[in-house]
């Protein structure tokens, strides 16, 4: 039986030490034989469902990341059974939790149960169309979001082209889609290879974007809209602090906070 309830304390007792050696970043995680080590992407989903929010990589809150609860042995190895970098693809594809750049413009996971509160806080009471009508978003973001009125999911390269980014067009595609993820309007639904003219996959897997509404439905995503956004934010901070009680207010703001 996995004992997630005190995983934060387990990390503090059993984690390997992160260091810079010969100019290279050494991952910080749990020892291979640590009973608290997460051993599969399915286990990682279970933990995300329990705690609600989880960045992919270590940050200012000790233990608050997938990195610190997995082994450092197989990162970027390409082994689908052991590599947490591969797991993120399976998790995004599963649709059981949300994956995207939600934490300080960096990647992480949010449980389905908590996503409506996250959306209510980050959207600040506005659906995207309402935000546009009020003059609160850029035309670049409007061009991106307009594409999802026609198709539920889009490869990053498709979205970039359709939204008018690239040579001679709009600039800062990556920054724009990151801001939309931070705002609760987009997520990464999958990672897929491109298809050649014969329909055969090739190359590295590419991010596939979608709206949270396409994943879980408008009514579900909007189910916390009756709450004040500030209250949703307070509950999210409280939830993270409950699982990581050593987190300071400053650290919480750095990892969770966002100034539009």
Which residues does each PLM region occupy?
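Long, low-complexity intrinsically disordered regions
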Residues: 2-260
């Amino acid at each position: 039986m996995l004992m997630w309830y005190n995983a934060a304390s387990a990390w503090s007792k059993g984690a390997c030490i992160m260091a810079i050696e010969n100019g290279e970043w050494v991952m910080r995680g749990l020892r291979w034989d640590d009973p608290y080590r997460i051993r599969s992407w399915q286990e990682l989903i279970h933990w995300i469902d329990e705690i609600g929010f989880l960045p992919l990589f270590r940050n200012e809150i000790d233990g608050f990341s997938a990195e610190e609860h997995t082994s450092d042995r197989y990162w970027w190895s390409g082994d689908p059974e052991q590599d947490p970098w591969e797991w993120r693809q399976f998790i995004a594809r599963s649709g059981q939790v949300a994956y995207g750049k939600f934490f300080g413009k960096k990647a992480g996971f949010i449980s389905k149960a908590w996503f409506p509160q996250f959306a209510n806080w980050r959207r600040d009471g506005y659906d995207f169309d309402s935000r546009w009508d009020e003059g609160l978003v850029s035309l670049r973001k409007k061009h991106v979001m307009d594409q999802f009125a026609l198709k539920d999911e889009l490869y990053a390269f498709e979205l970039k082209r359709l939204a008018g980014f690239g040579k001679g067009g709009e600039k800062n595609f990556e920054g724009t889609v990151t801001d939309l993820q931070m705002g609760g309007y987009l997520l990464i639904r999958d990672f897929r290879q491109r298809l050649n003219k014969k329909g055969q996959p090739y190359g590295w897997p590419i991010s596939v974007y979608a709206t949270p509404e396409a994943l879980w439905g408008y009514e579900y995503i909007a189910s916390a809209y009756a709450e004040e956004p500030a209250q949703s934010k307070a509950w999210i901070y409280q939830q993270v602090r409950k699982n990581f009680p050593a987190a300071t207010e400053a650290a919480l703001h750095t990892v969770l906070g966002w100034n539009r």
